[in-house]
């Protein structure tokens, strides 16, 4: 790499785990959230990786469960004046970029993402400046500032198609921030891709040794893998794809048992899609190792019922997402470029 910052060497302190609630407390906060959503003219959008009780509440209140971009697009189309975003901070920023006129609230602004943290704007800008002949493509899991520095924003569901398109135009690519997804895209397309070296702390922990042992126990199970996983895991997969693509694969594959290599939060919607199938968590520790994330993002876990209620009730600087107007305009350009590209794919 041509910059001093090394995402692979960075260690991000995990937040403390939320204090567990008893059943009475859970019911109290569920009812409080439902009341506050009505009072605030708000709708709740939740990511696939949040805890099951959060996703369930989003469903019960007419909200949305999806990936980060679809969460933001749902909010932009919804009549509510306030969006409660249950996810991590860059997701709230994306919602604000697409809905600047709305109040964007989060349970906590301290919910981070290792991909976002691993791609600080100053270092990334210097990296881009060192390679001015390359088109800059950044994953949706980045800050508004990084998006504004990019030519394109992309999601994992269309990453291969977009890079194929740019490669057909003879363009060389800078890809950021996830090195595993960038490597996957490069191998699928053969494009000239220079990768930033970030990684998701959840997907980076999947290990081939432990997975091989699990496959021996369940020899007839299919393996579903998110492309943020290491190449060695991707090569073992029966299906590779984004969160929504993995849920579709779960329905399409004939296997009755599915080993799932992504954040276990996805099990809520995946099990709804295939109630007759057995879902198994892919192991995240190799021989003699211990997991850090254990297949669940610690920042996603910060989106608890109590925090959601506090976000709706208190608002203010501790919960409201703000994006500078100039930064928003800069980030909106590559986002809209991607949305236009998606529209052409579906036409």
UniProtKB/Swiss-Prot annotation:
Documented EC number(s): 2.5.1.72
Compartments where found: Cytoplasm
Major subcellular location class: cytoplasm
Catalytic function, reaction form: iminosuccinate + dihydroxyacetone phosphate = quinolinate + phosphate + 2 H2O + H(+)
Cofactor binding annotation: Binds 1 [4Fe-4S] cluster per subunit.
Binding positions (iminosuccinate): 47, 68, 139-141, 156, 226-228, 243
Cofactor(s), names only, from the UniProt record: [4Fe-4S] cluster
A GO MF term: 4 iron, 4 sulfur cluster binding
Signal peptide coordinates: none
InterPro entries attached to this UniProt entry: NadA, NadA_sf, Quinolinate_synth_A_type1
GO cellular component: cytosol
Superkingdom of source: Bacteria
Catalytic class of the enzyme: transferase
Binding of [4Fe-4S] cluster, residues: 113, 200, 297
Metabolic or biological pathway: Cofactor biosynthesis; NAD(+) biosynthesis; quinolinate from iminoaspartate: step 1/1
Gene3D superfamilies attached to this UniProt entry: NadA-like
Family to which this protein belongs: Belongs to the quinolinate synthase family. Type 1 subfamily.
HAMAP family: NadA_type1 (MF_00567)
Protein name: Quinolinate synthase
Native species: Salmonella gallinarum (strain 287/91 / NCTC 13346)
Lineage of the organism: Bacteria, Pseudomonadati, Pseudomonadota, Gammaproteobacteria, Enterobacterales
Gene: nadA
């Amino acid at each position: 790499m041509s910059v001093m910052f090394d995402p692979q060497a960075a260690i991000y302190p995990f937040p403390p785990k939320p204090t567990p609630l008893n059943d009475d407390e859970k019911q109290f906060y569920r009812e409080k959230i439902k009341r506050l959503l009505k009072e605030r003219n708000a709708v709740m959008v939740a990511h696939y990786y949040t805890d099951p009780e959060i996703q369930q509440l989003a469903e019960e209140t007419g909200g949305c469960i999806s990936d980060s971009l679809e969460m933001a697009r749902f909010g932009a189309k919804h009549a509510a004046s306030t969006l409660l975003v249950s996810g991590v901070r860059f997701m709230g920023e994306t919602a604000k970029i697409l809905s600047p006129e709305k109040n964007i609230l989060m349970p906590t602004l301290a919910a981070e993402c290792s991909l976002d943290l691993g791609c600080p704007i100053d270092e990334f800008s210097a990296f881009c400046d060192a390679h001015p002949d390359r088109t800059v493509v950044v994953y949706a899991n980045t800050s508004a500032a990084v998006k504004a520095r990019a030519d394109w924003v992309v999601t994992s569901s269309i990453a291969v198609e977009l890079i194929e398109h740019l490669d057909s135009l003879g363009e060389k690519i800078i890809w950021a921030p996830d090195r595993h997804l960038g490597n996957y895209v490069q191998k699928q397309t053969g494009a000239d891709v220079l990768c930033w070296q970030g990684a998701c702390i959840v997907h980076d922990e999947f290990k081939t040794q432990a997975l091989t042992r699990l496959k021996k126990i369940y020899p007839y199970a299919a393996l579903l893998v998110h492309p943020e996983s290491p190449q060695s895991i991707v090569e073992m997969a029966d299906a590779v794809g984004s969160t929504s693509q993995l849920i579709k694969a779960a329905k399409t594959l004939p296997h009755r048992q599915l080993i799932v290599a992504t954040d276990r939060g996805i099990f809520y919607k995946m099990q709804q899609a295939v109630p007759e199938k057995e879902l198994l968590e892919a192991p995240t520790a190799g021989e003699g190792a211990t997991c850090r994330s254990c297949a669940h993002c610690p920042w996603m876990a910060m989106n608890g019922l109590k925090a959601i209620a506090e976000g709706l009730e208190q608002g203010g600087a501790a919960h409201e997402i703000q994006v500078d107007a100039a930064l928003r305009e800069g980030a909106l350009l590559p986002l809209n470029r991607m949305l236009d590209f998606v529209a052409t794919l579906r036409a």
